[in-house]
């Protein structure tokens, strides 16, 4: 059974087909969610939220792109919404609690792997997402443009800028 037939069966209410569709795509959805969020628990939540959204909107899937591309666009949206929510909550620290926030001195330079992870985390959301989708997940610029709803040229320039920022932040490791 091909993926279109599987999707049609899920829309018709076939729970086994839904489980098959989930089992087929969940590992890559989780992988992308983990790379974008950097946290296993958040990645599990994002994976769950992604499939809840996908199954509730499955009838809206037109098939213009691959089903996995459509799912990954949902992952990006869910992670982005979660990050915005976290930032909003972080800003809402009460003034009387603000005095208890301590500043710590940066530790000695960790190894390269930790520095790379930190440098990627420091990228803007748009740059980080584009970098992960292209360099780690292996999507083409056209697929990323479709997922993010931006022109292909924007994806290319974001990737170039992300790589330039990483080179700058990791220059200390260059010999």
Q: Would you name each region that the model predicts?
A:
Residues 90, 97-121:
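Acidic, proline/glycine-rich intrinsically disordered inter-domain spacer in sigma factors
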Residues 56-63, 73-93, 109, 161, ...:
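Arg/Lys-rich amphipathic alpha helix in sigma70-family domain 2
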Residues 76, 80, 136, 148-172:
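DNA-recognition helix of helix-turn-helix
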Residues 22-40, 57, 120, 169-172:
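Amphipathic, Lys/Arg- and hydrophobic-enriched alpha-helical face
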Residues 31, 45-52, 65-77:
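Structural recognition of an alpha-helix C-terminal capping motif at a helix-to-coil junction
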Residues 7-31:
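A short, charge-rich alpha-helical start-of-domain segment used by transcription regulators
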Residues 11-12, 38, 49-66, 85-87:
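Sigma70-family region 2
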Residues 1, 118-121, 125-129, 133-154, ...:
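Helix-turn-helix DNA-binding module
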